[in-house]
Amino acid sequence: MALSKRELDELKPWIEKTVKRVLGFSEPTVVTAALNCVGKGMDKKKAADHLKPFLDDSTLRFVDKLFEAVEEGRSSRHSKSSSDRSRKRELKEVFGDDSEISKESSGVKKRRIPRFEEVEEEPEVIPGPPSESPGMLTKLQIKQMMEAATRQIEERKKQLSFISPPTPQPKTPSSSQPERLPIGNTIQPSQAATFMNDAIEKARKAAELQARIQAQLALKPGLIGNANMVGLANLHAMGIAPPKVELKDQTKPTPLILDEQGRTVDATGKEIELTHRMPTLKANIRAVKREQFKQQLKEKPSEDMESNTFFDPRVSIAPSQRQRRTFKFHDKGKFEKIAQRLRTKAQLEKLQAEISQAARKTGIHTSTRLALIAPKKELKEGDIPEIEWWDSYIIPNGFDLTEENPKREDYFGITNLVEHPAQLNPPVDNDTPVTLGVYLTKKEQKKLRRQTRREAQKELQEKVRLGLMPPPEPKVRISNLMRVLGTEAVQDPTKVEAHVRAQMAKRQKAHEEANAARKLTAEQRKVKKIKKLKEDISQGVHISVYRVRNLSNPAKKFKIEANAGQLYLTGVVVLHKDVNVVVVEGGPKAQKKFKRLMLHRIKWDEQTSNTKGDDDEESDEEAVKKTNKCVLVWEGTAKDRSFGEMKFKQCPTENMAREHFKKHGAEHYWDLALSESVLESTD
């Protein structure tokens, strides 16, 4: 018979005990499987088959004990329910079937309101002022309540025994005695004592709860008007005269007393300094305590130790407790930097040792010492020093130079040897020889292509022979249709032609897909174009300097700026009257295109707006002389760039223009352009 979920929950502890008794440990999987068997109403045989994968040899023993546990759980549950039912019936027989008791109780209910009126007439129950309302019950009051409840129960027992004297009867089970006991019968003494204890416990709890409620209401006298009256009446009805309970004084802060000047004083008038407590964090408190602890550890040695002749104050005394070291991770790349620094230092020391050794052999160390000598004072521009700094090393101190030729012994460090300094390679030249690529003829290119295809075809044939790939389909075209297919083409030429055309379309599609895969995307084409324009300038930067007489036309300014940006050129355009200098830096190909722009594409001799209005009164000769043009001043290479992105700078004076070039270390560009402009104007 299948069981409900509630019954399975009640049987689960019994099954767990059985599993632990059989297996020696608890296993939730076996418990769940056993519950499923019991819940589905299986017999012992089916349950054994169901549990055999979990238990193996101990299955039968476990199933027997399982069903015994199930029966034991059912019997205990049934006995518990029957005992509850018998207990309820006995209570009903004792308290519910007595007519006089019911009448008495109904009378009590009917007289509930008059009883309050009687209580109000008694002077002892009338409460005092609201401040004296009852609080929590004391031990004495609880004892009085217990005695009153005991007296009531004793009186009730006497009434019951007076109505019908007790007669001992044999105890029979409830199932064999369905008829109810008569009204006059009494209960057994043990059951009466149990009921009496339950009644006393309930009365005590009710009294405690009532007293607690009254104590809470006493703290708020205006909340419920007659709450005190009702509580006192109930206590009086139980035969307890409640004493007057005084409320405890609530803890209030000490009143603040201020004098005429606003200072805090006590009752005697003495000034009081109040402690001001500021909010702080636990971390700050711990930090202060930590510092105090460190100060205690760093106490000075005692005087008797200092008086010792062997005492050394320079030696620090080790603390009694080791300082706590925090756990700290190293930054990423820290040890790589240290290792690189050590390697660089070792290489530098090795190089210095080699240089010094070579200098001792060749005698260059003397010239090196000469080169390290610098002038001791700053000379003004145009001043001639008495002795050049490279001669000061060989001329001793206090030596007076005269017109007569001094002796050779008067000088220091002069020998018959000639020192040749080591030649250095230029920083921008590349010593690697340039190798020209091998250019093949058409016949050689075809031969090389045939050989490459033959090698690839041979590799495919080897794979087909080894079974690594299937053999390729015959490459059929319309021209070789009859030769390849033969009889199939004769039998159904339409079908064969469709098959051949499908193969041709497939090959065409594969070819186009391969081309599309090799084709660069828009982003890749953009990167390729930028890479092509951004030339390699590691071997040197190509620089060109142009001079334009008039650069006031905004269209020409835009052309210069736009083309410089498109060709990734850097530089500057300095605008000055009759001397407009354009400096551009970049690769050789970009310089070639920009040179063509400046010297050929832009028409500089076109009439500008600035010269049009002012030259009306001038003669034709002056107009011819002031014809606008662009001149290439200088072009060459440098190691690095001097300017950034192309910008225009308006310089009203020559000094301002030269200072701008000097700031970038290229003032010679301005000097060269200005000198050519002056020479041209003089001509």
From Swiss-Prot:
Residues 1-87 form the PWI domain. Changing T494M: In RP18; reduces phosphorylation; impairs binding to PRPF4; impairs self-association; affects interaction with the U4/U5/U6 tri-snRNP complex; does not affect global pre-mRNA splicing. The modification Phosphoserine is found at S164, S619. It is found in: Nucleus; Nucleus speckle. GO terms for molecular function: identical protein binding; RNA binding. InterPro entries: Pre-mRNA_splic_Prp3_dom (IPR013881), Prp3 (IPR027104), Prp3_C (IPR010541), PWI_dom (IPR002483), PWI_dom_sf (IPR036483). This is U4/U6 small nuclear ribonucleoprotein Prp3. It comes from Homo sapiens. The gene is PRPF3.
